[in-house]
A protein has these predicted regions:
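Active-site His/acidic residue clusters
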Residues: 198-247, 282-295, 430
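Histidine-centered active-site microenvironments of extracellular/periplasmic hydrolases
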Residues: 64, 264-321, 328
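Active-site-proximal N-terminal segment of extracellular/periplasmic enzymes that hydrolyze or transfer
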Residues: 37-80, 86, 419-430
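A short aromatic-rich beta-strand->coil structural motif
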Residues: 43-44, 49, 150, 162, ...
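Short, structured active-site-proximal loop/turn typified by the sulfatase FGly-forming signature C/S-X-P-X-R
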Residues: 61-93, 99-104, 156-158, 436, ...
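C-terminal cap/loop subdomain of S1 sulfatases and analogous C-terminal strand-loop tails that border
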Residues: 284-290, 296-297, 318, 330-333, ...
């Protein structure tokens, strides 16, 4: 009997330990799942540059091939009627990263005001140019940015590509490529020459077990339109001119880089809890003769400059679907902050794209277009060219007579006239009055 005592004693201790373990296990699992649920998602922001809203396979272009973006659209909550508030690079990008209208963040234009009598080339190399850019950068810092706000949740953030406002750190990024050049300096290598800085950053953030934000804003398909010959050859016989073929090939080249980035996320096992958002900073229509932008595109008050598909992919949380509801790039900041467990600021006018009720209830969006160079760095209204709004499928454009003295009010039915050819303002005066009252209630400078 005695020789079995140690065995009985060990069995008793084992059962006691098992009982304690079983009692502890639910608490452990609850904590584990709570921690997993509290893990903020990674964020990848893909922002194309000078890209017309219809120039994608999934948006119906008959020739341009965009298989990676088509796939992303099919995996995302995709808004076919997305807009940016301004059709110019710098203010549009500033709105994406702040969640504010240009008149709110005050970065309304690409460059500081040119002194009377000074040529642009001389101005860009003068101390006045850098002094003006410093004011612009301070405006952005005062407004607050997405990377700054996400740092409260421990995010590491990387800037690549287009960046107008001096050193990347001025935007709150912890990592970056742009050191202060006008619109990106070495950051402009991303996409065209390399994707490695993004891959290295993702590896570093993953190793540190930190959530991350990637700002992928390559200068693509923006000119210079220098696509690889293998892509250009695909479009030479399909496009109406060589400049158009070059632009089409640039779009496919950009699409390839997006595919490489998304593939990298998959290979690293980051797909499920990484939010990928997409928008273009503004539109573009190629002048078939010159290769520059045509009317009604970049820098204009028309959909050719303002409209862009907007996508949000989050496999762990979001069911893919195509939507014809209105969306705006101003929605990114509140959406991503909420996803990270943070509250949007009261100044942010955008909606959470994941709040289906709010998105369905919204019928109107607003925007504003400004001069390429500031008129006054501290007075947004001084640089204003047009205010605009879309109410359902009706679009109103109101010029600022101080800068556009020859322009008239414009009203379009976007469903019947998506290229905005027939101005209905003279025939629908009551509608113009009704919508102008809404526009003035939004912002009347």
């Amino acid at each position: 009997m005695a020789r079995y005592q140690p065995v009985h004693g060990a069995t008793f201790l084992t059962l006691l330990q098992m009982r304690q373990t079983l009692l502890f296990l639910p608490c452990f699992l609850i904590c584990l799942f709570a921690r997993a649920a509290d893990t903020p998602p990674n964020i990848v922001m893909i922002i194309s540059d000078d890209h017309l809203w219809s120039d994608y396979g999934f948006m119906g272009h008959p020739h341009i091939k965009t298989p990676s973006l088509d796939k992303l659209a099919g995996e995302s909550l995709t808004f076919r009627r997305g807009y940016v508030p301004s059709s110019l690079c710098c203010p549009s990008l500033a709105s994406i990263i702040t969640g504010l209208y240009p008149h709110q963040h005050r970065v309304t234009s690409n460059d500081p005001p040119i002194p009377a009598g000074m040529k642009p080339g001389a101005f860009h190399s003068s101390p006045l140019f850098e002094e003006g850019r410093e004011v612009m950068s301070k405006h952005l810092e005062s407004a607050g940015t997405l990377p700054q706000r996400l740092s409260a949740k421990g995010y590491l953030s990387l800037q690549t590509g287009k960046w107008w406002l001096k050193h990347f750190s001025r935007g709150g990024f912890t990592h970056g490529m742009t050191k202060g050049g006008r619109h990106g300096d070495s950051g402009l290598d991303i996409g065209r020459k390399t994707m490695q800085p993004i891959y290295d950053f993702i590896g570093e953030a993953t190793q540190q077990q930190k959530p991350f934000l990637v700002w992928y804003a390559p200068m693509m398909p923006h000119d210079p339109h220098t696509p690889p010959k293998r892509l250009l050859d695909k479009y030479i016989d399909k496009a109406p001119s060589l400049p158009v073929a070059k632009y089409w090939a640039m779009v496919e080249w950009f699409d390839e880089t997006c595919g490489a980035l998304l593939k990298h996320l998959d290979e690293k096992g980051l797909r499920e809890n990484t939010i990928v958002v997409y928008v273009s900073d503004n539109g573009w229509i190629t002048n078939p003769k010159t290769g520059r932008y045509a009317e009604k595109s970049k820098q204009s008050q028309y959909d050719g400059g303002l409209r862009s598909p907007i996508m949000l992919r989050w496999p762990a949380k979001v069911q893919p679907r195509m939507s014809d509801e209105l969306a705006t790039s101003l929605d990114f900041a509140p959406t991503l902050l909420k996803a990270a467990g943070l509250e949007p600021t009261k100044e942010m006018p955008g909606l959470n794209l994941l709040d289906g009720t709010a998105i369905s209830a919204r019928k109107t969006i607003y925007g504003e277009c400004f001069t390429h160079n500031f008129v006054d760095l501290n007075v947004p209204a001084s640089s204003l060219k047009w205010r605009w709004m879309v109410d359902g499928y009706t679009k109103l454009i109101v010029p600022n007579k101080a800068n556009q003295p020859d322009d008239s009010v414009e009203l379009y039915d976007l469903k019947a006239d998506p290229s905005e050819e027939k101005n209905l303002a003279a025939d629908q005066a009551a509608k113009v009055t009704e919508m102008t009252a809404k526009l003035d209630a939004w912002w009347k400078p």
